[in-house]
Amino acid sequence: MIRILAVLLLLPAPCFAQVRGAAVSVVPQINLGAGMISPSVPLMDGALLPLSMSLPSAFGAIAPAPAASPFASPAAPVAAQPAPTALSALNPAVAATPAKTASPVTAAAVPVEVQKSASNAMFDGALNILIAGSEAVPFIKTGGLADVVDALSRGLSARGHDVTLVLPKYKNLKTAGVEFKNAGTVSVPIAGRVETANLLVGRHEGVRVVLLEHPEFYEREGGPYAAKHEALGLSAYEAAGIDDADERFGFYARAALEAMRVLDIKPDIIHAHDWHAALIPSFLKSVYKNDSFFADTKSALTIHNIAFQGAFALATAGKLGFDEAHLNHRGGANYMKAGITDADAVTTVSPNYAREIVENVLFAMGLEEPLRARPEGVQGIINGIDPVMYDPATDPDIARHYGIEDVAEGKAANKAALQAKLGLDIEPETPLFVVASRLAHQKGIDMIFDSAREIVRLGGQLAIAGAGDAETETLRAALVLAFPGRVGSHPFDEKAVRLFFAAADFLIMPSRFEPCGLSQLIAQRYGTLPIVTRTGGLADTVKDLRDDPVHGDGLIIRAIASISLSRAIANAVSGYHHPDAFPMARRSAMEKDSSWEPSLDLYEALYRRLLGTDGPVKR
């Protein structure tokens, strides 16, 4: 089968390619797992203009431009929004819901009802902050959420705050050299019974880490989010009445609050992340609304990906001690909806993603009503990366260290190392494109496969690091077989992928939606120019070289379609061979500040607004 596909790839008409010049409607089917919403999201390609490969526009103008900049090109139409009829077909009730005239995407101050005293603070200006997220580096990681929860916790601690991070103690959780000690137990009523967890407490880089030890809920095979029927070796047909994700994370949310009581730490701020922790604000507003221990506590909820909502049967509400109306959303219990409604502040991981989920029902995934109902809005705060962890000058997992001044030499050495590792032709002058992500439809893997032929035709190479389903893996293997020496692949590995970033000239990241994204920030740090779609945080973090050749640090695909990606790749190859433009673009990318410091400033300002304190936080 793989050999047959490889032969098809070599035929004149690419077996994956879109018809050139045609408007394409792409309907991703998003498999979100247990407790998730799974809509079909139509995304349409806009009109496309012919490619011009001529200089002086080094990265290839889409059309001749009157502007003085050698990189300038008029912005091609962004992917067209679907017509109202398309929205009605998706969900007539949602389509009929108009957006508010004043967009609730804002960073405005939150109304303060209770002025906060400093009695709970360790010292003047410092806050007791509880961070609640289902995963965190270095203990457990399945995705970017773990990086963000860890970096935010350590960053706030480094600024003088007393930070407590609460995690479930999963079976495959790593202790990371932290010595955990038993600190008592917490008990939570669920469905007429009482569930109890041991509290294990340790310290990691200044952060108090609390593990909830509940073997039945968390110490099971298959990872943090494995369904119970999977852990028991049962089929999906046998799952009815067995799966317990609603109880596992309903317990987690309330147990995190009870842990603070046992440890006698009154939190000033509780910062919950994604649906797994989204019930914490709801517990504060219902079960604990008259509890003096949490009387001065304020809550914030950060939405990392609104597609993951924690949607269950409405009976879940009663099991956790809520009225059904409190969790009800379109006939089911929805944890994310409850958190959006009850949190004192709601943020998400980039300004553009905040706009998308509030203003566009397709991105809101059915939660546009509670989002728009928040009078103070939704604030977008971009994620950062750790500049110490991701530093090509010190990274132990790359072939040669380098900085801005010797990036060309360092890149060449790392490129040769990766080419040798993957069996690619050793060609230092060849533009090297890499992919480092899940090989999924949401990440645009179909467009990447479609465009591989164009990369090879233009004399480039493609290296793919990631993992996908069986069909995707078969297609990847066929691609490598069809283009020996030009296309290589490697399983995704945190250490191995560092060499990809250090070796590459361009990162391909054509996501259909991307709340923030970290790979493009890491790529820029390593002098690799990202090629991205204009969505979510990608639009906030990549400046198109065709619009701003002086400060640009990547290329933005003009529409979500394979032909648009192929044209951006052609632009990239054109610019790569320009003796001045490419080094300048690489320098701009490496000089960019993508650290957590600006975002930590914004989070501290948000906490101050919630607590009603004036002036900067004292450290």
Language-model-detected regions and their locations in the chain:
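Catalytic cores of nucleotide-sugar-dependent glycosyltransferases that transfer UDP/GDP/TDP-activated
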Residues: 117-619
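Hydrophobic core
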Residues: 9-14
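Sec-dependent signal peptide recognition
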Residues: 1-7
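Long, low-complexity repeat tracts used as extracellular stalks/passenger repeats
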Residues: 15-121
